[in-house]
From Swiss-Prot:
CC annotations in GO: cytoplasm
InterPro entries assigned to the protein according to its UniProt record, in alphabetical order: Mur-like_cat_sf (IPR036565), Mur_ligase_C (IPR004101), Mur_ligase_C_dom_sf (IPR036615), Mur_ligase_cen (IPR013221), MurD (IPR005762)
Protein name: UDP-N-acetylmuramoylalanine--D-glutamate ligase
TM regions (residue ranges): none
Keywords, sorted A to Z: ATP-binding, Cell cycle, Cell division, Cell shape, Cell wall biogenesis/degradation, Cytoplasm, Ligase, Nucleotide-binding, Peptidoglycan synthesis
Subcellular location: Cytoplasm
Pathway note: Cell wall biogenesis; peptidoglycan biosynthesis
Length: 439
């Protein structure tokens, strides 16, 4: 544990995470000040009036007067004012680093371009089913520091590349980079810089769980995991066995469960299940808990979720597909009886969409593109139409639907150009799906 008493600490960014940092540091008797570049930041009304607050810009003087800066993951350490503070010898960390210095129980840490929320939630359910008190948080749900208020046996953290940039003391019992595909290219110089941020999760961990099908998830010499295990369809420690047309989840030579006994569907979710099993076993979670969770965990909202079905048409909400890799995962191995009506669009975050081209140029796939980067996506397929909004796209495709068709929202883009969040986008899709059937 670190002594923060009397230290001058500036927290950048309010919201749930920023407030959790303020609460933690004030309880440790630090002298806390808060900066938020928004003029009216979320959470300002919850901040104790005795805490100095500067809004609308980064206050360079406050930063230079600090012993430590706790930076919001949404702000890059490359920002000029932060670089000036670093050059002056000010320590810059994130909330996850504060958590790691304090946590006394084992941590399972999960990152990746796609699937990390599903795996985080599934591992959490495995631990709970085994009788453990599990704290789940980080980039999903509860801020990590808030988890310290409970007496948990195990922490399961979803971590973003942004959070990992300023995390140095993780020392996870088990950690994984599920996959690495282009995302946040408006923040990183290239894919390798993004990957290196992800790989920080392996520093000093006991077991690194790597994706045997994605060499970018393998630790470099810079990391120092005590041991490494892999998951993949074949030739891995955790793998899929096919026998008499059925697929089985395997841990080395031991059969865990048939894939048709788990609630998660699709090849990408079978990979997620293998990763979760590997992490859980590395952390000593009992097999009984692992099996129970696999049989009962239904998946997360907005992750390839059946939003509605009527007249033989399935409406599938995959609004969480905020990057190309996630949409590729949704489309790979997808089998439908009729036509696939694919909704694409939003803020592409500077990504290269070309990986989608081969997947969507099929006679049974029709693309309906919308939003900020809709025009770029529409160029990928000869069977594309361009719209301003998702609602306009759905109005157009509705009369063409026939039994056996699927309408899939898997946009390959962030939502913030037109929606408050990917959740709001998914909710609007679900509303329109049900309205579409009602009409």
């Amino acid at each position: 544990m670190t002594d923060y008493q009397g230290k001058n600490i500036t927290v950048i960014g309010l919201g749930k995470t920023g407030l959790s940092c303020v609460d933690f540091l004030t309880a440790k008797k630090a002298n806390v000040r808060v900066i938020d570049t928004r003029k009216i930041p979320a959470g300002a009304e919850q901040l104790d009036k005795s805490i100095p607050l500067h809004t609308g810009s980064l206050n360079q003087q406050w930063l230079l007067e600090s012993d430590m800066i706790v930076i919001s993951p949404g702000l890059s350490v490359k920002t000029a004012e932060i670089q000036t503070a670093l050059s002056a010898g000010v320590e810059v960390v994130g909330d996850i680093e504060l958590f790691c210095r304090e946590a006394a129980k084992p941590v399972i840490a999960i990152t990746g371009s796609n699937g990390k929320s599903t795996v985080t939630a599934l591992v959490t359910e495995m631990g709970k089913a085994a009788g453990l008190s599990v704290g789940m948080g980080g980039n999903i749900g509860i801020p990590a520091l808030s988890l310290l208020n409970e007496n948990h046996d195990l922490y399961v953290l979803e971590l973003s590349s942004f959070q990992l940039e300023t995390t140095y003391s993780l020392k996870a019992t088990a950690a994984t980079v599920l996959n690495v595909t282009e995302d946040h290219m408006n923040r990183y110089a290239d894919l390798e810089e993004y990957r290196q941020a992800k790989l920080n999760i392996y520093h000093h961990c006991q077991t690194a769980v790597i994706n045997g099908e994605d060499p970018l998830t393998k630790e470099d010499d810079k990391q120092s995991a005590q041991q490494q295990v892999s998951f993949a369809e074949n030739n891995a420690d955790y793998w899929l066995k096919t026998e008499n047309g059925k697929k089985y989840l395997m841990a080395k030579d031991k059969l865990i469960l048939a894939c048709d006994e788990i609630k998660l569907t699709g090849r990408h979710n079978h990979m997620n299940a293998l990763a979760a099993i590997a992490l859980a076993q590395a952390a000593g979670i009992k097999n009984s808990g692992i099996l129970t969770a696999l049989r009962t965990f239904p998946g997360l909202a907005h992750r390839f979720q059946l939003a509605h079905m009527a007249n033989g048409v399935r409406w599938v909400n995959d609004s969480k597909a905020t990057n190309v890799g996630s949409t590729v995962a949704a489309l790979t191995g997808l089998h439908i009886e009729g036509k696939l009506h694919l909704l694409l669009g939003g803020d592409g975050k500077g990504a290269d969409f070309s990986e989608l081209e081969k997947l969507i140029n099929k006679p049974e796939i029709f693309c309906y593109c919308f939003g900020q980067d809709g025009a770029h996506l529409a160029k990928l397929s000869s069977q594309s139409q361009l719209f301003n909004t998702m609602e306009q796209a759905i109005e157009t495709l509705r009369p063409t639907l026939k039994p056996g068709d699927m309408v899939l929202l898997s946009p390959a883009c962030a939502s913030l150009d037109q929606f408050a969040s990917f959740e709001k986008r998914g909710e609007e899709f679900t509303r329109l799906a049900k309205l579409s059937v009602a009409q």
